[in-house]
Design a protein with these regions (language model features):
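N-terminal Rossmann-like NAD(P) cofactor-binding module of classical short-chain dehydrogenase/reductase
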Residues: 63-68, 88-90
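Hydrophobic Val/Ile/Leu positions in short beta-strands of Rossmann-like dinucleotide-binding domains
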Residues: 4-5, 67
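NAD(P)-binding Rossmann-fold cofactor-contacting core
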Residues: 26-40
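Rossmann-fold NAD(P)-binding glycine/threonine-rich loop
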Residues: 92-114
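Rossmann-like NAD(P)H-binding beta-loop-alpha module
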Residues: 117-130
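Hydrophobic/small residue at the entry helix of a nucleotide-binding pocket
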Residues: 10-11
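ADP-ribose/adenylate-binding Rossmann-like module
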Residues: 80-98
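Rossmann-fold cofactor-recognition segment
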Residues: 42-54
Length: 130
């Protein structure tokens, strides 16, 4: 099982560094390889340019895609995960297009986990508090 982490923006780096330090297999995908190397190159050399076709070729059943990319990438990456028998995680809110994938994911025994970011977390806590 490999974790395919996409995106090394400011909000992604602390969690990515922690994950790499656990020793689990992580491949880092980023639009700018140099930026990813600056962020985590001291911890891993498994850094690749973000290319959907390359991710799809590398993806194996049971792998996990973590998307820390802008929201317009989440549904295409989740669909890719489903076709390859992989799981998907993002920090963003659930869009109607993502929700539409739920039945297919459940039928395949796969997890599509969303809303694990700071903003959704604060919203959920505040809603519970109110």
């Amino acid at each position: 099982m490999t974790i395919h982490w996409s995106g090394t923006g400011l909000s992604a780096i602390p969690g990515l560094r922690e994950l790499i330090q656990t020793g689990k297999p992580v491949t880092v995908w980023n639009r700018t390889v140099e930026k990813a190397q600056d962020a985590v190159g001291d911890l891993t050399q498994d850094i690749k340019r973000f290319e959907p076709a390359m991710i799809e070729a590398a993806l194996q059943p049971g792998d996990v895609i973590v998307s820390m990319l802008p929201g317009d990438w989440h549904v295409p990456l989740a669909k890719m995960a489903l076709t390859k028998g992989a799981h998907f995680v993002s920090s963003s809110y659930i869009s109607p297009e993502m929700r539409a994938l739920d039945t297919q994911a459940k039928a395949a025994g796969l997890a599509l986990v969303n809303e694990v970011g700071l903003d959704p977390g604060i919203d959920h806590l505040m809603a519970h508090y109110l």
